[in-house]
Amino acid sequence: MSKLEQFYFDAKGNRWFQYFTVFCRIALALGFIPSGIVKVTGERFTALPAEHPLGHYFDALFQTGYYYTFIGIGQLLTAALLLIPRTALLGALLYFPTILNICVLAYATRFEGTRITTLMLLGSIYLLCWDYDRVKYILPFKRSNAAAYPAKKKIISNRFPFLFFGGVILTIASVIIINIFIFDIRPGNSLEECTNGCKGSNYAKSACGFCDCIYNKGKPLDSCLKEYKRAKQREMDSLKTAINK
């Protein structure tokens, strides 16, 4: 048995790992319940304006009728499965592709909620890893003969895993910091938020032009980003020319 497998089996029998697993299940379920209820009741999911890239997507999704309701039912079902210990693995299997899609969508539209969706995705991956002893049989990887070391369900250790939780804190901090610098400009959640952000930019004119392109002209995100990059380049060239003079 490898050291990684030994660590896994030890973790399954650790009280603090089990507490963290329960926390992840509850937190991820709570992330789906409000949005699921909104969809089932036939209400619009967010207050994002239709001109916002993600708001435009949600507007189109809202117009799909019972498909919109179906998504809400799926989210509520997934949340319920996560909260029930016997069905938690099935809930995690359903949760992962859903949150992966949401996370990619958030990054593609430069939504402000990328931090939350990233942490939710990492949480779902953790839950799948927690039940590795049950899902390993469908994975295309070579498995060692660890049948003699079943994953322990009973608590056999109360030792606090400082290294693991230190890694969790470091991961959360990394997600927050990376998301601050990953995009040089975002559309914000409204025109006001976008314009307030562009005033503090080194290229305020280009940034404000980007906000105007998104919210007033209603152009696609890719088109506005291209215009922003061209305008930013002109500002940079003008600044260099002024410095050389």
Question: Can you name each region flagged by the protein language model?
Answer:
Residues 1-41, 88-245:
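Extended, low-polarity transmembrane helix blocks
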Residues 10-16, 22, 51, 57, ...:
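Homeobox/homeodomain signature
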Residues 15, 72-74, 85-86:
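Short, glycine/acidic-rich beta->alpha junctions
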Residues 31-71:
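Solvent-exposed, well-ordered loop and adjacent helix/strand elements within mature globular domains
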Residues 38, 81-82:
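Short beta-strand segments in beta-sandwich/barrel cores
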Residues 55, 72-81, 97-105:
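Hydrophobic, membrane-inserted alpha-helices
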Residues 59-66, 83-92:
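Short, amphipathic, aromatic/basic-enriched membrane-interface segments that mark the entry/exit
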